[in-house]
Amino acid sequence: MAAAAASPSPATPPRILLAGDANGRLHQLFKRVTSVNQSTGPFHALLCVGQFFSPDAGDGDGGGGGEVADYLEGRAAVPIPTYFTGDYGPAAPRLLAKAASSARGFSPGGIQICPNLFWLRGSARFTLHGLSVVYLSGRKGPGGPGCYSQDDVDALRALAEEPGIVDLFLTNEWPAGVVNGVDTSNAPSQISDPHGYDPVVAELVAEIKPRYHIAGSKGVFYAREPYVSDSAAHVTRFIGLANVGNKEKQKFIHAISPTPASTMSSVDIHARPPNTTLSPYISPAKSVPVEETPKRPAEDADLQYWRYDVKKQRHGEAGGNRLCFKFTSSGSCPRGSKCNYRHDEEAREHYNRNVCFDFLNKGKCEKGPECRFAHSLSDEGAVRDTKPRSERRRVESSCWFCLSSPDVESHLVISIGEGYYCALAKGPLVPNHVLVIPVEHCSSTLKMPVEAEAELGRYKDALAKYFEKQGKIAIYFEWVSQQSRHANLQAVPVPLSKASSVKKIFHLAAQRLGFEFSVVNPDGDANRARELLRSECDSKSSLFYVELPEGSVLLHLVDSNEKFPAQFGREVLAGLLSMADRADWRNCKVSKEEEIQMVDDFKQGFREFDPAE
């Protein structure tokens, strides 16, 4: 019997082997693992993704039953601790039946089916030699053995909201869209085959944001360029593995030695390789439901629900008679009849007439008089600024952009007018990245008084002349959310040679997120476009817009239940400029001394154009 691999010392990162679809060829797989372990080891674990059991129905020699049975019955030994997720194949239910029946309780770290061999069943998160590992076993399908369920998916969605970085995410199938945004001209031709891709996996990885995503089922080896997800400090690396013993000699075993994120420094976690791209995935807000599947046996299903219902109960959200926010706010819910919450058309009608959702759901609202929505059915339609004057002053005193606030970084200011001022962006995407900011505390430049538009126009004209001397043109964009505090219109200078590509790249980015921009004033009059934008803006709407070089505007009105990335504009322009490593402003911060020097340099060049001079 093979001994378990020794644990690494606390100062040494664990060494992990990854393998693709074994397809029942365990002798060949473990022979290769033994060879690698002897020559370049020791390795502490083997993680197998893709189909572990043979696709053949026979139990004889070469069949999945024959080789697996050798290990289950002790005729052969598994060389190092091995974990698999691909619990499907004709013989799999019979071979796993004993382990399934003897399993007691929930085993996130796997069910042992023989010494050193562990079945990762369902979905869960566990720790392996300090690494946080999340997995989804089975594959997309009509239900039953070997197919993951909606319960498994929901459990992972709940886990995604918990703190901590996931080091490894294991799935059997590739995430749909993983090759978006990269050059695939030198990649294996099989990646263009739709077989083996799964949109549900794409949603999950976009929410979980692991450091490594490992998958099988495509029959090829492919290591994608690292990418950075919205709001994630780290990059994600996708590795697809080939089948064991494939004729094309594609790589089916791969070694990694990642330091657990829990022990890494902030600098190391934020490190971005030069070939980092933006995330290839659509927004997880556009939920793709799992196909209708028969429920697991009651005991197993209860275990699955326990994993995410504990979180709901902890926060007082255990379904029952509570309203479904997604249905109440949008009129639809991807879980349909399987949703744990109430779908009430009458409540939706009240919500659409501005009755507070918490009032409808709980009979009270913790915000009390500060809430801007109605707290009785007879007061429908009320949307009001209920904050007392003292409260508004308190908000403004803690605002980053109010000039009277002690928190404002005044050393970044480059010009102050009557209604607007300009400042260099903190953590700029590119040099001379400017913010045009209302002097008064206002949540959007579109809500400023009409007379302030003239001054805004003068600032934009001045910036245009300043950037023109550098061979650049400014791209303006603004994100306006219901939670916005103080508006800032961002002006990012891009080379004139890139100007014609701005419209296309924003349309492509929108398509990736699952929405389409509407074009405001396609005739190209920038002033008229701003007028039309102001008519679209109301106090209840979240929106994003970008002003194109030719004068038209791309506008997206954001649904209340839509997860729109706050850094969308910056991320898209980072992609246009091949600066994905600078998409997050926190990666671009410099010292205060450097900021002061940048402001001085900007002022010297801008002085001749500054409308406030």
Swiss-Prot record:
Keyword annotations of the record: DNA-binding, Metal-binding, Repeat, Zinc, Zinc-finger
Record-linked InterPro entries: Cwf19-like (IPR040194), Cwf19-like_C_dom-1 (IPR006768), Cwf19-like_C_dom-2 (IPR006767), HIT-like_sf (IPR036265), Znf_CCCH (IPR000571), Znf_CCCH_sf (IPR036855)
One Pfam family of this chain: CwfJ_C_2
One GO-annotated biological process of the protein: mRNA splicing, via spliceosome
Name of the molecule in the record: Zinc finger CCCH domain-containing protein 59
Domain of life the protein comes from: Eukaryota
GO cellular component terms listed in the entry, alphabetical order: post-mRNA release spliceosomal complex
Molecular-function annotations in GO: DNA binding; RNA lariat debranching enzyme activator activity; zinc ion binding
Zinc finger (C3H1-type): 318-346, 350-378
SUPFAM superfamilies in the record: CCCH zinc finger, HIT-like
Region span, Disordered: 275-296
Species this chain originates from: Oryza sativa subsp. japonica (Rice)
